């Protein structure tokens, strides 16, 4: 048997899906299959071809195709799900639940049929509940179904901190726990600039303001765009997770993982620090939390559970 490139399928060829495909191709992480509904097959093929035609200039080797036929995704190593309706201004993530749950179930059936051994990364909002839906529908083990929110939330937090301190974002590390939404819990105690705790560098009221802006980061962009939601940073975050799995990097990354007792919670998907590598979620890292952080996390869990009550 000859060596084969990895195969990564992206379900949903909207702004986020297409941007993810473009980043993955440039990183040469594998061949890319971009999938959308039959009515959008031609535009999807057009996007894929346009990206492919950039490869001689950007200097990457990757085959990129657009399709509406899941047979083209057969034997994918990683499948990224971005399909679903997007949030409009004034709409909460929860309004999306029922529509997107139906989409998740339909997509998951096809994914499992053609790629029974793949890893699935879910981006569709409300992401904690949608990841749970995909997990249940797929019958996959918990390590192979992962949600993306923490990498993005942490990226926003790190961006704002770097701006505040006028430092390189590369030197800023941070962690965000909990649900993806207004109840996320940025763990300032575990956040550093070049190994120096942020609390020693930024006054408390400024840090609180950064935390607040991070919580509302998605909404800030929704309001500015006026139509649609963020896609560059979400796509970059998905690509980082795909890379960790495909290259077996064993990265410490926040991800939405299925909890079985960690942090005192059972049977839900929640954003936690994980080790992400060739086996997907290889470990959930349990951090010591203060009473205040535990209370904030409990509130976050409550929000996730409230959304899950809406699930059919």
Curated annotation (Swiss-Prot):
Modified residues (Phosphoserine): 149
SUPFAM superfamilies noted in UniProt: LDH C-terminal domain-like (SSF56327), NAD(P)-binding Rossmann-fold domains (SSF51735)
Keyword NAD: yes
Reactions this protein catalyses: (S)-malate + NAD(+) = oxaloacetate + NADH + H(+)
InterPro entries per record: L-lactate/malate_DH, Lactate/malate_DH_C, Lactate/malate_DH_N, Lactate_DH/Glyco_Ohase_4_C, Malate_DH_type3, NAD(P)-bd_dom_sf
Gene Ontology biological-process entries: lactate metabolic process; tricarboxylic acid cycle
Keyword Oxidoreductase: yes
Signal peptide as annotated in the record: none
Annotated EC: 1.1.1.37
GO MF annotation terms: L-lactate dehydrogenase activity; L-malate dehydrogenase (NAD+) activity
Annotated residues for binding of NAD(+): 12-17, 36, 100, 123-125
Swiss-Prot/TrEMBL keywords: NAD, Oxidoreductase, Phosphoprotein, Tricarboxylic acid cycle
Active site: 180
Residues that hold substrate according to the record: 87, 93, 125, 156
A Pfam family matched in the record: Ldh_1_N
Gene3D superfamilies: Lactate dehydrogenase/glycoside hydrolase, family 4, C-terminal, NAD(P)-binding Rossmann-like Domain
Similarity comment: family membership: Belongs to the LDH/MDH superfamily. MDH type 3 family.
Protein task: Catalyzes the reversible oxidation of malate to oxaloacetate.
Protein name (record): Malate dehydrogenase
Organism expressing this protein natively: Anoxybacillus flavithermus (strain DSM 21510 / WK1)
Lineage, uppermost ranks: Bacteria, Bacillati, Bacillota, Bacilli, Bacillales
């Amino acid at each position: 048997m000859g060596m084969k490139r990895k195969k990564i399928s992206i379900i949903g060829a909207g702004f986020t899906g297409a941007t993810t495909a473009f980043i993955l191709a440039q990183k040469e992480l594998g061949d890319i299959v971009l999938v959308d509904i039959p009515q959008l097959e031609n535009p999807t093929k057009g996007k894929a071809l346009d990206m492919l035609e950039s490869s001689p200039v950007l200097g990457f080797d990757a085959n990129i195709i657009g399709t509406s036929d899941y047979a083209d995704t057969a034997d994918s190593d990683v499948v990224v799900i971005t399909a679903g309706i997007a949030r409009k201004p004034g709409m909460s993530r929860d309004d999306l639940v029922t529509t997107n749950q139906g989409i998740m179930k339909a997509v998951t059936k096809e994914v499992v049929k053609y790629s029974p051994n793949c890893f699935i990364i879910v981006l569709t909002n409300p992401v904690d509940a949608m990841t749970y839906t995909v997990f249940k529908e797929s019958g996959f083990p918990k390590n192979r179904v992962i949600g993306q929110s923490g990498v993005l939330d942490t990226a926003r937090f790190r961006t704002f901190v770097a701006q505040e301190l006028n430092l390189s974002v590369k030197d800023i590390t941070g962690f965000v726990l909990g649900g993806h939404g207004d109840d996320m819990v940025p763990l300032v105690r575990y956040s550093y600039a070049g190994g120096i705790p942020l609390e020693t560098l930024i006054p408390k009221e400024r840090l609180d303001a950064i935390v607040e802006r991070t919580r509302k980061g998605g909404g800030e962009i929704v309001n500015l765009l006026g139509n649609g939601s963020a896609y560059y940073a979400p796509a970059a975050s998905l690509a980082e997770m795909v890379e960790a799995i495909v290259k077996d990097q064993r990265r410490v990354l926040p991800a939405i993982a299925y909890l079985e007792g960690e942090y005192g919670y059972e049977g839900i998907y929640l954003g936690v620090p994980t080790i992400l590598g060739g086996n997907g979620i290889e470990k959930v890292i349990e951090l010591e939390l203060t009473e205040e952080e535990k209370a904030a996390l409990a509130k976050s869990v409550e929000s996730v559970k409230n959304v899950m009550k809406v699930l059919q």
